[in-house]
């Protein structure tokens, strides 16, 4: 907690406060600050309870009782009591035990006999989110952090892991909406801060929207020849944007929980092609009779076929962009709703007018005198 607090302060202030700490605390805090930001090393509690395999159950409980009295007022009191690291004489990690394992063990049982086969650990240089996800997936109270030789350095507690996951969810939610995450509560942030956090992406998106305008200008002759086509532009680009955003959200979430990786791009494309095609066929089938009744079959067929093509394309774009972002080291959440929608808007119009140009070619030629 001291390391986290100092990390958020200006360098000069943090340095003065660090020098004011007792030597033992200063040494521990300096060690934590030596690890990269967002690393597991920055998040760990560097004073875990450590036992050797030949420690008896009674000796272990006695040590935990003594430690509980020493850290009764500490922020990680409950975790210090609930988890124990088992190491050899060189502090090489052998496994972790929970208090329940010791309490329920028969008298005289050695700690080493209680270790299970499945054990988890992370490097001090691993990403904090990776460590937090591991704690969540394995349902751990604490996750050991080790060095290159598997010697224990500390533990990451479940409460700290949940804070990391909450922060990641908040960050993804902001970026999915096209805004930078806030570093302070919403009601305490100034209006200028809120505007700055949102304005950057709005500028990017409004510049990207010029692609859509250029496409409309390029196909101006088609629109003038068949004016009815312009009526369906909002519906088509809206459908494509929504389909792409849904695909992006699914893949971003899958990346966050390590269900997919950038190398799975072909598998993702294969799945999204099928999903997009099925969605397009379903939507096209629903609207075809309505459009045929209100307008005429050529228009109905053009719009229905365009929806199939746009939904398929939008799902591919929405599925692939987060994988590309991850490969480039960019937060995949950036390529969620706003970016995908803007890109699909422009490319969707190209698909629409290209299909219309083929199906309604005779009508366009007659209208233009070609």
Please describe what each predicted stretch is:
Residues 74, 121-129, 270-271, 342-350:
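Short, highly charged low-complexity linear segments
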């Amino acid at each position: 907690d001291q390391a986290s607090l100092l990390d958020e302060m200006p360098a000069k202030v943090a340095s003065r406060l660090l020098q004011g700490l007792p030597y033992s605390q200063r040494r521990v805090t300096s060690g934590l600050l030596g690890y990269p930001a967002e690393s597991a090393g920055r998040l760990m509690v560097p004073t875990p309870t450590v036992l050797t395999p030949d420690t008896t159950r009674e000796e272990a409980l006695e040590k935990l009782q003594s430690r509980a009295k020493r850290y009764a007022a500490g922020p990680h009191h409950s975790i210090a009591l609930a988890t124990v690291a088992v190491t050899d004489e060189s502090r090489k990690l052998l496994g972790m035990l929970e208090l329940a394992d010791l309490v329920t063990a028969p008298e005289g049982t050695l700690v080493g006999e209680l270790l299970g086969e499945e054990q988890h650990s992370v490097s001090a240089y691993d990403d904090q989110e990776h460590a937090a996800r591991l704690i969540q997936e394995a349902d751990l109270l604490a996750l050991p952090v080790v060095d290159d030789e598997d010697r224990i350095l500390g533990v990451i507690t479940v409460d700290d892991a949940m804070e990391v996951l909450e922060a990641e969810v908040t960050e993804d939610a902001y970026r999915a909406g096209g805004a930078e995450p806030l570093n302070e509560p919403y009601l305490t942030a100034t209006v200028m801060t809120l505007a700055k956090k949102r304005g950057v992406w709005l500028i990017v998106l409004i510049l990207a929207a010029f692609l859509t305008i250029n496409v409309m200008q390029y196909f101006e002759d088609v629109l003038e020849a068949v004016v009815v086509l312009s009526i369906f532009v909002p519906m088509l680009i809206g459908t494509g944007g929504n389909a792409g955003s849904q695909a992006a959200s699914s893949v971003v979430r899958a990346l966050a929980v390590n269900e997919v990786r950038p190398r799975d791009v072909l598998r993702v494309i294969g799945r999204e092609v099928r999903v997009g095609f099925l969605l397009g066929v379903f939507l096209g089938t629903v609207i075809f009779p309505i459009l045929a009744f209100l307008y005429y079959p050529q228009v109905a067929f053009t719009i229905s076929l365009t929806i199939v093509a746009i939904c398929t394309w939008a799902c591919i774009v929405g599925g692939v962009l987060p994988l590309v972002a991850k490969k480039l080291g960019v937060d995949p959440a950036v390529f969620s709703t706003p970016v995908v929608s803007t890109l699909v808007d422009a490319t969707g119009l190209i698909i629409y007018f290209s299909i219309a140009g083929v199906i309604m070619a005779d009508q366009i030629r007659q209208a233009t005198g070609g």
